[in-house]
Amino acid sequence: YHGDRNGGLDSKEAFADFAEQCFDMGYKAFKIHGWHEGDAKEEAENVLHVAKKVGDKMTLMLDPACQLKTFADALYVGKACDEANFFWLEDPYRDSGVSAFSHKRLREMLKTPILQTEHIRGLETKCDFLLAGGTDFLRSDPEYDMGITGAIKISHLAESFGVDVEI
């Protein structure tokens, strides 16, 4: 899930090499799940390094999985995503993705779109988050969002606002 300090995805070079391997296997996009220490400087360096190696041939996304410690850390890493032309920044910091206000502020300060609502459950709360301006994309998970019926309703919600939903 995340980068692994015990080998595997243990460095920015390893992430970039893996992204290149994925491209060689035919993948057109690559989502980074960095390390779980929440080191903003290291995450930003990883973003820029991977983009330098494959950014001109793959769509890149970053999911820190709520591991960045502060809003400022999310802004710092988000600026790296801007520089590297990332497609989205997902669940960036440790509010667990539940503050529409703070994510609206982050959206206003970045050009990289924000993907939120993985940790927001149900149709109404996702609608509230979207209407408050806290996200550019919606996330739905049938396991947690009222089953297949709930996921379909969330998809219809997204469609009605012209927003994509990631399932």
What are these regions (language model features)?
Residues 18-33:
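Catalytic domains of carbohydrate-active enzymes, especially glycoside hydrolases
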Residues 34-167:
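Catalytic core of soluble alpha/beta enzymes
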Residues 15-22, 46, 50:
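Structured alpha-helical segments in the cores of large, soluble enzyme domains
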Residues 1-16, 63-71, 115:
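Active-site mouth loops of central-metabolism enzymes
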Residues 12, 24-27, 83, 158:
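Generic intrinsically disordered, low-complexity segments enriched for polar/acidic and small residues
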